[in-house]
Amino acid sequence: MSGTAVARLLLRLELPSPGVMPPPPTDYDYGGPISDDEFLASAMATEGPTVRYDLFPQNNSQPTLQIVLNHTEVQTDLQYPHYEDLGLDPDPNWTRICEDVYNPLLENNRIEFWVCGVLINIVGVLGILGNIISMIILSRPQMRSSINYLLTGLARCDTVLIITSILLFGIPSIYPYTGHFFGYYNYVYPFISPAVFPIGMIAQTASIYMTFTVTLERYVAVCHPLKARALCTYGRAKIYFIVCVCFSLAYNMPRFWEVLTVTYPEPGKDVILHCVRPSRLRRSETYINIYIHWCYLIVNYIIPFLTLAILNCLIYRQVKRANRERQRLSRSEKREIGLATMLLCVVIVFFMLNFLPLVLNISEAFYSTIDHKITKISNLLITINSSVNFLIYIIFGEKFKRIFLLIFFKRRLSRDQPDLIHYESSISNNGDGTLNHRSSGRFSRHGTQRSTTTTYLVATGGPGGGGCGGGGGNNSLNNVRLTQVSGSPGLVKIKRNRAPSPGPVVYFPAREMQRSASTTNSTTNNNTSIGYDWTLPDSKKLGHVSSGF
């Protein structure tokens, strides 16, 4: 260090309790150059335990020496590794306790505006819209399943996380660079931060463990299908979601006591400034080392990352093996494999977008260093991770995409892509008072075909009724015209083309039926199967119904 320098002394204040703050720190400037010995002697002679000295060379704006007396009682950079969680600068030396931070020429304000004020807000709004659409589609009756309920819970957590990200990082980053939204920056943000910040941390933890739960559910369904009947049920999925939320709430409960709101009257102006500052708990070195660094790293990153990596490797191996034997897979097994492939993409995106935050937390925990630009990018990546699942569902989820088009583009699809359904049905007399009704349908849409076969057991009122209902020739069953097959008195056959459906999703049987409260076992042609009782409008019962749709 050179022999002469210009020294500037900045008096640091111990953070008081919430309330009106005392006058701002006082700056002392020495007009001429002083020697190192004079500087150190002046520093040691100053009273008060919270004094910091910044030594500036004459031709440099950056200090070459910083001396903090009794630094365990003051706020140091090392004690604030997570100020970015609140959108605050980790070193409050540059500002008063509360200060108007509007400065469009400051590089940090410009970067924060474009990364947080623009990108986080745009991505967040689109992500909220996508998650709402995902929740609507996944909650449809035809999408009712354990995995879809878990994905709905994941969308809920991601939506809350995006909202808190916008409130904490997106909107407050606009004012320091543009001068707009001062009312939010000064009168809203400081008062909601003590509650919104812990809610955001709860949502982040819940989102991570919902991703873990989804992967675990897919692992059981793909690798242990026999256990899936007991473990992967709709009721258990609700329990898994509640457990994840309760665990996240319990783990992040101390966050509610980490920050507080302070007020400061601007000297010479009729304005009261508000800002957020860390509480005494948040300034505790033990709390920071144990809870902020190690617990956060282990609970939010190490445990879920390692578990997700292992489970997805096992799922990928099973999917790869199944693809080699795809010809021998049943339709339900192919559907499970396709769903597992889609969720593999979800987890891969999760790894990619959370890798930088993981590196950043490791750097803070072990090296006590932090780059504010990287922190802002890290917050953006976490927001993107909570916003992209809808796109993955649209790209890889065939049924999800079909229902999405049906809900939001129903009229256009009906006009531009009419459906063509070929329907065939046959009814034979069993000779014991019942009819064996077999129907098949072929559904053509967008150049593809889908077939279904349905078997009914219809009571006719007595054996040998001469066809259907004891009549000969033509009869009517549920508004369906039956034609007697010549030479076969016990066989009635129907063949017709059904009118186009209003959308791409078709349910068979298409006639109006009401589902009774009970399920029964019915026997058709000596084949026993389990199904639902269906009741026609004329009170005739249909036995087992099995649909290939």
From Swiss-Prot:
Extracellular topological domain residue ranges: 1-117, 180-181, 260-289, 363-376
Keywords, comma-separated and alphabetical: Cell membrane, G-protein coupled receptor, Glycoprotein, Membrane, Receptor, Transducer, Transmembrane, Transmembrane helix
InterPro entries listed in its UniProt record: GPCR-Ligand_Int, GPCR_Rhodpsn, GPCR_Rhodpsn_7TM
Tissue: Expressed in ovaries, heads and bodies. Expressed in dopaminergic neurons.
GO process annotations (BP): adult locomotory behavior; behavioral defense response; flight behavior; G protein-coupled receptor signaling pathway; larval locomotory behavior; neuropeptide signaling pathway; positive regulation of cytosolic calcium ion concentration; positive regulation of synaptic transmission, dopaminergic
Glycan-bearing residues: N59, N70, N93
UniProt GO cellular component terms: membrane; plasma membrane
Keyword Transmembrane: yes
The keyword Nuclease is assigned to this record: no
Membrane spanning residue stretches: 118-138, 159-179, 182-202, 239-259, 290-310, 342-362, 377-397
Main location: membrane
Disruption phenotype: Deficits in simulated flight behavior with fewer or shorter duration of wing beats in tethered flies. Dopaminergic neuron-specific knockout leads to shorter flight duration. RNAi-mediated knockdown, either in adults or during pupal development, results in similar deficits in simulated flight behavior, whereas knockdown during larval development has no effect on flight behavior in the adult. Pan-neuronal or dopaminergic neuron-specific RNAi-mediated knockdown leads to significantly shorter flight bouts.
Topology relative to the membrane: Multi-pass membrane protein
All ranges on the Cytoplasmic side of the membrane: 139-158, 203-238, 311-341, 398-549
GO MF terms, alphabetically ordered: neuropeptide receptor activity; peptide receptor activity
Subcellular location: Cell membrane
Entry function: A receptor for the FMRFamide peptides. Reacts with high affinity to FMRFamide and intrinsic FMRFamide-related peptides. By stimulating intracellular calcium signaling through the inositol 1,4,5-trisphosphate receptor, Itpr, in dopaminergic neurons, may be involved in the maintenance of neuronal excitability and in the regulation of flight bout duration.
PANTHER family: FMRFAMIDE RECEPTOR, FMRFAMIDE RECEPTOR-RELATED
Family: Belongs to the G-protein coupled receptor 1 family.
Protein name as catalogued: FMRFamide receptor
UniProt organism field: Drosophila melanogaster (Fruit fly)
Lineage: Eukaryota, Metazoa, Ecdysozoa, Arthropoda, Hexapoda
Gene: FMRFaR
